[in-house]
Amino acid sequence: GRLAVVPIGYWSARFAEGARCTIFTERGSYRGTILPLMASGHTYGDDVDEQPTGWPYVEIRVDARCSTAEEAIRLGIDVGDVVSIDPQPEFLDNGFISSRHLDDKAGVAVMFAALKALIAVKDQLPVDAYFLFTIEEEVGIGAANILTEDIASLIAVDNGTTAPGQNSAEFGVTLAMADHNGPFDYHLTRKLARLCREDDIYYQKDIFRHYRSDVASAVVAGHDVRTALVCFGIDASHGWERIHIHALRSLAELVTAYLLSPIAFWRDAEEVGTLEDFTSQPTEKAEQKLSSDVRMDEIPDEAVEE
């Protein structure tokens, strides 16, 4: 009568243990709990702590009369029924939000906040903008099949990862410079950084080595678009996640500022362009006060590069 489960996308079974859930069947929904195979200390003793972690070692206890496979079938439970996990959100007075599924429901909230701000200011956007909400990013499809030919730039709103070795933060905007598939568009990302500075939006940059965003799936699918990834920092992503409202507000401000900003790449409107006005990276040398004949005790602070 217990149900085996498999994840959709990547999610560690470590964070599934103890989760309350809903099983959706063709005859209606049932409630249940995801438990390790050995869940009772009174029955299994120390073996409870010594059992492995992984999806083969957890099961769903259905809150119904369901002690055998036959009883589960009579309830209408079948192979392939979808299971949803309770998010159990908590909003703290100090601005922190703890919950499951902040990746990427928090991104949806950011986009709706930007939409609300655009409606409030009633300014005409310099170019058409589409707000796209994907539901298949976790399985690698993402934005592969939702872009039209007239889209020139694609900015994904997703989570950054606050962890040792990363530069993301739960405050301000995190601008992703690259993910698992490679770097994002230099000029589009540079424009986003400039907007942050002009509008006093706190930001930092980061690179994600084990991360694949919607923009990656769009490029792999063959869409000729500039790409960027803007993030809110999440602690313990895909686990018991936590963010701060400061990051969400900052990100909504950046999205709004970007949509209201002048078009930077008019040549992108042409299907095929010339080398005239082709975007290029700066090649001039950075100015330094350090010279080859300076003594060590005379090294100026401006010459120290961070």
Give a label for each model feature.
Residues 1-306:
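N-terminal hydrophobic/helix-forming segments and targeting peptides
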